[in-house]
From Swiss-Prot:
Disulfide bonds listed in the record: C25-C40, C34-C46, C39-C53, C58-C62, C93-C156, C168-C176, C275-C307
Record flagged with keyword Nuclease: no
Main location: other
Organism of derivation: Solanum lycopersicum (Tomato)
Up-regulation conditions: By fungal infection.
Name this protein carries in UniProt: Basic 30 kDa endochitinase
Length: 322
């Protein structure tokens, strides 16, 4: 064999060897997914054994989570989730011991087609950033001079702080159970019997009789928040439809300055208290979380982040714990 032919074969073999050794999936491979239903390990390799799929070893396409067509691993990895919520397991937080885990989040998301999987990669990343930002504000344990800044302390609390009431509104459709209280719980701090009832029905759990499941079962906890996010409550659109660009404001919305963007989501969640009166520290806190999370995911936050000049849709359905 001539020297030139040997050199060519050697170079070809080297290229193939390097290609074979490159990471295959997840954050190490630009969000790529594994084929044939394989798990993506925390190191970026595809496989089907415990080293790839086991708790703590799997970053995406994990057992119990959504499949390749609806997987969140291409949008947010376990390590990104931990970076965003890096103080959620602080000793001062109710959610310590990893209650709000990545696996619980991904598992819950699998029950809601379209969540974090609608549109192009920019739209998907913005939805995850917006969801985690709004829920981080609702559960934050941060303060202005907190270590790593105020926007690193989301998902600290499980239950509404202080001495909340029972949040029971007389209802024949969603009757309050004796001795049960419907104060804020979980990532979105869902409150009131008229929210616990339909949420429980949607996710297949009796939350009217067992409201504290939202603060004791991690998957149910995330499901309660994603249910609220995905569900329109007239005249409000769903948060999902707003952030993915599916919502088109009506004439009444435009007259109220309610235009597509993160600000309308704040209006949906707690506009009766936070929107329509100029600058509000709670709104700015939500925006601060959103900007930070968009930065981690490598996407711009878009426009219309504030709701200071928007008229509210009506009274907020949730309790604000700030």
């Amino acid at each position: 064999m001539r020297l030139s032919e040997f050199t060519t074969l050697f170079l070809l073999f080297s290229v193939l060897l390097l290609s074979a050794s490159a990471e295959q999936c997840g954050s190490q491979a630009g969000g790529a997914l594994c084929a044939s239903g394989l798990c993506c390990s925390k190191f970026g390799w595809c496989g089907n054994t415990n080293e790839y799929c086991g708790p703590g070893n799997c970053q995406s396409q994990c057992p119990g989570g959504p499949g390749p067509s609806g997987d969140l691993g291409g949008v947010i990895s376990n390590s990104m989730f931990d970076q965003m919520l890096n103080h959620r397991n602080d000793n001062a937080c109710q959610g310590k011991n990893n209650f709000y885990s990545y696996n619980a989040f991904v598992t819950a998301a699998g029950s809601f087609p379209g969540f974090g999987t609608t549109g192009d990669i920019t739209a998907r990343k913005r939805e995850i950033a917006a969801f985690l930002a709004q829920t981080s504000h609702e559960t934050t344990g941060g303060w202005p001079t907190a270590p790593d800044g105020p926007y690193a302390w989301g998902y600290c609390f499980l239950r509404e702080q202080g001495s909340p009431g029972d949040y029971c509104t007389p209802s024949s459709q969603w009757p309050c159970a004796p001795g049960r209280k419907y104060f804020g719980r979980g990532p979105i701090q869902i409150s009131h019997n008229y929210n616990y009832g339909p949420c429980g029905r949607a996710i297949g759990v009796d939350l009217l009789n067992n409201p504290d499941l939202v603060a004791t079962d991690p998957v149910i906890s995330f499901k309660s928040a994603i249910w609220f996010w995905m569900t329109p409550q007239s005249p409000k659109p769903s948060c999902h439809d707003v952030i993915t660009g599916r919502w088109q404001p009506s004439g009444a919305d435009q007259a109220a300055n309610r235009v597509p963007g993160f600000g309308v989501i704040t209006n949906i969640i707690n506009g009766g208290l936070e929107c329509g009166h100029g600058s509000d520290s709670r709104v700015q806190d939500r925006i601060g979380f959103y900007r930070r999370y968009c930065g981690i995911l490598g996407v711009s936050p878009g426009e219309n982040l504030d709701c200071g000049n928007q008229r509210s849709f009506g009274n907020g359905l949730l309790v604000d714990i700030m």
